[in-house]
């Protein structure tokens, strides 16, 4: 009940992402500058949970999007970014992100080992 009440207020989901072993040589994380994608680039995807149905977004490519990646991230570095904000009046409510096959990665690069943690931030007003 408390969680459902909290979700009625404004909330944001903040993500922390980092390597857990060796520097990332293969499939690095890339994020899209939230100012560079258009609302029509978003594709709604339904997520089914045991007691509710939610939704997430996927992003269709558009030439105006600007993507940034972080090669060779070490376990001493972390990215912190907002992946969602429930306030629909804000620009930059989402930070689209994914990994990608970096063509400059060595052919024998080890698989990426990383961890992501998502936290919820709840606002009073």
Positions of PLM-derived features:
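N-terminal start-of-chain detector that recognizes signal peptides
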Residues: 2-4, 51-54, 88-91
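A contiguous catalytic/ligand-binding core that recognizes phosphate-bearing ligands
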Residues: 1-39
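Short amphipathic alpha-helical surface micro-motifs
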Residues: 1, 11-14, 40-41, 49-50, ...
């Amino acid at each position: 009940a408390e969680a459902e009440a909290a979700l009625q207020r404004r909330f944001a989901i903040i993500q922390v992402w980092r390597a857990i072993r060796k520097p990332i040589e293969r499939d690095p994380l890339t994020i899209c500058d939230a100012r560079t994608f258009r609302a029509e680039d978003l594709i709604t995807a339904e997520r089914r949970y045991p007691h509710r149905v939610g939704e997430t977004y996927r992003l269709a490519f558009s030439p105006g999007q600007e993507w940034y990646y972080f090669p060779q991230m070490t376990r001493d570095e972390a990215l912190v970014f907002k992946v969602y904000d429930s306030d629909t009046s804000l620009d930059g409510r989402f930070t689209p992100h994914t990994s990608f096959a970096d063509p400059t990665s060595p052919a024998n690069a080890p698989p990426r080992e990383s961890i992501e943690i998502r936290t919820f931030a709840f606002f009073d007003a």
